[in-house]
């Protein structure tokens, strides 16, 4: 068998119906859309409506809730801090504060604070002051000979 000899099984495909092509076609004039109304117009669909079938958002159970006073933190990884210090965008001699991280472009916005995580290689001796940090990030900074000061531990949790 060759590629050009391949074909669909009989009845597997159906010829496309061209609608709105005159009354003799059986799908002319209204084109199967009925008379007037929202559903006869083009590009209109009622979102979430599944033709009377119970919609997906109602079939699934309600779960969880949104915390009303949720804190959103900007996340910074130690590996990126290391790269910015090596590139000269952050001053490794001075304490690295949240304002310094924003000024360097490492973080776009502080949001409710900055949280440091331990992803990446880190071996610089730095003093970092941030709102929150993971335990592994604190260990990594202290192992390198620096210090990581968490200014607001309650907010970071």
From Swiss-Prot:
Disulfide bond recorded as keyword: no
A single BP term in Gene Ontology: translation
Keywords for this protein: Ribonucleoprotein, Ribosomal protein, RNA-binding, rRNA-binding
GO cellular component, as recorded: cytosolic large ribosomal subunit
Regions of compositional bias (Gly residues) in chain numbering: 21-35
SUPFAM superfamilies given in the database record: Ribosomal proteins L15p and L18e
InterPro entries listed in its UniProt record: Ribosomal_uL15 (IPR030878), Ribosomal_uL15/eL18 (IPR021131), Ribosomal_uL15/eL18_sf (IPR036227), Ribosomal_uL15_bac-type (IPR005749)
Cysteines engaged in disulfide bonds, as pairs: none
Keyword rRNA-binding tagged: yes
Positions of the UniProt region annotated as Disordered: 1-40
Signal peptide: none
GO molecular function, one term: structural constituent of ribosome
Domain of life: Bacteria
HAMAP family: Ribosomal_uL15
Functional summary from the UniProt entry: Binds to the 23S rRNA.
Subunit structure, interactors included: Part of the 50S ribosomal subunit.
Family stated for the protein in its record: Belongs to the universal ribosomal protein uL15 family.
Protein name, UniProt field: Large ribosomal subunit protein uL15
Organism from which the protein derives: Ruegeria pomeroyi (strain ATCC 700808 / DSM 15171 / DSS-3) (Silicibacter pomeroyi)
Taxonomic lineage from the root: Bacteria, Pseudomonadati, Pseudomonadota, Alphaproteobacteria, Rhodobacterales
């Amino acid at each position: 068998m060759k590629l050009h000899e391949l074909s669909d099984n009989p009845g597997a495909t159906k010829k496309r119906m061209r609608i709105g092509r005159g009354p003799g076609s059986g799908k002319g004039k209204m084109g199967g859309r009925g008379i007037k109304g929202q559903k006869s117009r083009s590009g209109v669909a009622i979102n979430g409506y599944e033709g009377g079938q119970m919609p997906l958002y109602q079939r699934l159970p309600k779960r969880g809730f949104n915390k009303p006073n949720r804190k959103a933190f900007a996340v910074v990884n130690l590996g990126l801090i290391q790269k910015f210090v090596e590139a000269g965008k952050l001053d490794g001699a001075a304490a690295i504060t949240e304002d310094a991280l924003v000024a360097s472009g490492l973080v776009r916005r502080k949001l409710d604070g900055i949280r440091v995580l331990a992803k990446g290689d880190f071996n610089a001796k730095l003093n970092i002051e941030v709102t929150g940090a993971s335990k592994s990030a604190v260990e990594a900074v202290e192992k390198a000979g620096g210090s990581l000061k968490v200014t607001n531990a309650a907010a970071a949790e």
